[in-house]
Regions:
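Core structural elements
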Residues: 27-33, 79-81, 88, 191, ...
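Charged, compositionally biased N-terminal leader segments and the immediate start
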Residues: 1-23, 30
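Short, solvent-exposed helix-loop connector elements
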Residues: 125, 203-208, 327-329, 345-359, ...
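A conserved non-catalytic segment of reverse transcriptases
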Residues: 192, 280-355
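Conserved polymerase palm-domain catalytic core
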Residues: 69-84, 88, 120-290
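A terminal-accessory region detector
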Residues: 380-431
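A glycine-rich phosphate-binding loop feature that marks nucleotide/adenosyl-phosphate handling sites
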Residues: 244-248, 285-293, 363-366, 383-391, ...
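Phosphate/adenylate-binding "loop-and-lid" substructures adjacent to NTP/NAD/dNTP-binding pockets
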Residues: 33-92
Length: 431
């Protein structure tokens, strides 16, 4: 099966306009069992309440029945279960949890779409892709600004992107490279499967349920056609100066050499989004002066130091190296820093009555995860400050375990010698 997917990827990579007419049959028993094997059994269950272990008890029979229903097209996806998770701004993000059998089918579709589209996605796309991620996106922006002539940044975010993907446009984009009617039928079935919230069914006329197995791939295909291809084939050709685009899911940053071209792009971007049923989040989208000459230009106009912009939890700001030369640096964004601090504080207080050895062990796992993401060049001071805040919360929490004070500060420091907290470390170099 993997050999066939590799062959599809080769055709997609070497053909100018590949069209795939027969790929639906790849969703057979072998692929379905492989998808079952790869799925994380600890994830939340859908409306059917079926877990991976329960489905696997009669795996051969279940898979055979599933594939037969796919073949005769009697298969019908179940609605996704709507749940909410908190966002940094205090609001809640809706997620759609598919039933277990739907997760299997969605992963199979994702594999096929991945073989077709991964070779065709542009290098400026970093979200939900193999061997690419947040750090690579941050590094790309750093290098473009450091070594190029970029002087203006358009930082944009799409309002409710996953909830407003237009189904008809989505299908048109897919039909550009896929003319297998059966696969298109299945994808449309999922787009229209609906959601179940508090026992009430709601149809889905637009959007792709965030949290589903297939949703990130569909989102990338949508952004590929709406944004990145447009930037490459239209925007770049109209520009006289340097420009670049870095995209991660619904978040993206564009850089320009000239202000007039940045303003032109920003205006056309809004119109482009509206054409495909999308809207920029006004509070998170803006054009700023940022780059090698931003500070001296603003000083000459009697203005304050250059503005900053946030991307993927980091704040970019104009700075200097040891020789006095320009360098764009990054640090944990204030919003993400405070969000993480609150989360750690709540966890520490909720777990303060557990044995110290257990608390430190689990806390270190969390801290190392924090360092692995935020431990990038120039951000060591910020992650060190984060550790100090965590230590303070831990000290206060330990002294609330009983009526009497459990530790003096010196005693607490001595205790940390026996149960040390993980030390900050820079894991990722941006240059």
């Amino acid at each position: 099966m993997e050999t066939k997917l590799v062959r599809i990827a080769e055709i997609s990579a070497t053909t100018k306009h590949p069209i795939f007419t027969s790929v639906y049959h790849l969703i057979n028993e072998d692929m379905s069992k492989q998808c079952h094997k790869e799925l994380d059994g600890s994830k939340a269950v859908g409306i059917d309440k079926v877990t991976k272990d329960e489905y696997g008890k009669n795996l051969d029979r279940n898979i055979k029945d599933l594939v037969q229903r796919l073949k005769n097209k009697s298969f019908k996806p179940l609605p996704s279960l709507r749940v909410y998770i908190p966002k940094a701004n205090g609001k809640k993000r809706p997620l759609g949890i598919a039933s277990y059998e739907d997760k299997i089918v969605q992963m199979a579709v994702k594999k096929i779409l991945g073989a077709i589209y991964e070779p065709r996605f542009l290098n400026c796309m970093y979200g939900f892709r193999p061997n690419r991620g947040c750090h690579e996106a941050i590094k790309e922006i750093y290098q473009r600004i450091s070594y190029g002539k970029i002087s203006y940044i358009v930082d944009a975010d799409i309002k409710g992107f996953f909830d407003h993907i237009d189904h008809e446009w989505m299908m048109k984009f897919l039909e550009w490279n896929i003319q297998d009617k059966n696969l298109l039928w299945l994808i449309r079935k999922y787009l229209k499967a609906g959601i179940m919230e508090q026992g009430k069914f709601e149809p889905t006329e637009e959007g792709s349920a965030q949290g589903s197995v297939m949703s990130p791939m569909l989102a990338n295909i949508y952004m590929h056609h709406v944004l990145t291809l447009w930037f490459k084939l239209v925007v770049k050709k109209e520009m006289q100066g340097e420009c670049f685009l870095v995209n991660f899911a619904d978040d993206f940053v564009a850089g320009f050499q000239y202000k007039s071209e940045a303003e032109r792009y920003y205006k056309e971007l809004k119109e482009r989004m509206e054409k495909f049923g999308l809207e920029l989040e006004s509070s998170k989208s803006r054009l700023i002066e940022f780059g090698r000459f931003a500070e001296q230009n603003r000083r000459a106009r009697g203005e304050h130091k250059p503005e900053t912009f946030d991307f993927l939890g980091f704040t970019f700001y104009c700075s200097k190296n040891r020789k006095g030369g320009f360098v764009p640096k990054v640090q944990t964004s204030r919003k993400k820093f405070e969000q993480k601090v609150r989360a750690y504080k709540n966890w520490i207080y909720d777990n303060r009555n557990r044995p110290m050895r257990e608390i430190i062990k689990e806390l270190n796992v969390k801290l190392i995860g924090h360092y692995r993401y935020y431990g990038v060049t120039w951000n060591f001071r910020k992650i060190t400050t984060f550790l100090h805040r965590v230590q303070q919360f831990l000290f206060k929490a330990m002294n609330r375990r009983g009526c009497r004070r459990a530790y003096t500060w010196n005693g607490f420091v001595e205790m940390l010698k026996y149960y040390p907290l993980a030390k900050p470390k820079t894991y990722y170099c941006l240059y």
